[in-house]
Structure formats: structure tokens, C-alpha cells
Amino acid sequence: MGGGVVHLVSAKNTRRLEGPDMIVLHYTAGTSAESSALFLTRPDVSASAHVVIGREGEVFQLVPFNIEAWHAGKSWYAGRGGLNRYSIGIELDNLGKLRFSGGLFIAECGRVVPPEEVYTDCSGDRPMYWHRYTARQVRVLREICTLLEETYPIRDVVGHSAITPRKIDPGPALEFAFSEFQDRN
């Protein structure tokens, strides 16, 4: 996976997973993979993930794959709820949905995103703008998903928005990266 994995400890996560049999993909909406990983390991934060993948392909593992992470929230998919118990959560360092204002693409955190890093989704009645995922992220994501599928009985790879209707991540900019996994299932 290029460069190895940085292991951080999310001591708040101790319950064993039942499975896992699905992978849930998220974006961080944070300013860097490292800052997002450190945030998610804080004991006062009621969220966590198994892995954070940075824009250069760097990987931070926060929770072992056989331990429950808190990434799915109130969730439901294929007739089953409480998906933290059955799923592996992968966060990708990405600013998510952008707004266009004054000729600039601006993330929710206030960061300006260069036009070459913007994905335009024209599937609705007006264009929506999203931060692009990098080729390295997509490659590492595919490698991790493949390894997980070889190790666990993974049936589904879905976006957070597919299991929690109030969420929009990982957004349409990532659809191409995990559609091949969905097509196999």
C-alpha cells in the first residue's frame, strides 16, 4: 500500500465486530488526513473509523478491523440496522461538497479548492461541486477493499449516504472508485 501504515490508538473502541461483512466509505471534510485521524482518536469525540486514507495515499489505522468503530451512526441497510456492529469504516481525506462563490470553490471549513481539484456533478437540475479524490487515494482504497474482501466475508461496499439518509458522503466524486465492488455483490 505504499509507505506503510501509521497506527494510532482509539482506546474508546473495545467492542468486537459481529462480522464484518460490509465496508462503509466516508469523507473527512477535514483539513488533513492526520488531523482527522487525531481528531477521531480523541476520547471526547463520539466518532471513529478503522482507517483514514490521505490524499497522497498515506494510511492511518485507528481501530483494529475486528473491533467496532463508531462511523455509521444511526444507520440501516438491506434490512439491518446498527451497522457499526457489522461494518468497517474507511474515511478518505476530502473536503466534500463545495460552494461556488465569487469565482471560488469553497469548502465548508473555509478552505479554497483549486479548480483542477473540483468535480462537477451535473446529474441534478443545477451543477453541484465536490472535492475530487486523488488517484493515489483511489488506488489505496481499492487495495484496502480488496485485502478486506480476501480476509472477511464482505458483501457490500457502500457510501455513508446509502446507510444514513441525512449524510451525503462520500459524494458522487467517488462513485467510480467503489462501483466495481458494488457490481460484484
Regions found by a protein language model. Name each.
Residues 2-155:
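Active-site-adjacent loop/helix surface patches within enzyme catalytic domains
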Residues 152-167:
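Acidic/histidine-rich, metal-coordinating catalytic segments
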Residues 165-185:
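Short, low-complexity, polybasic intrinsically disordered segments
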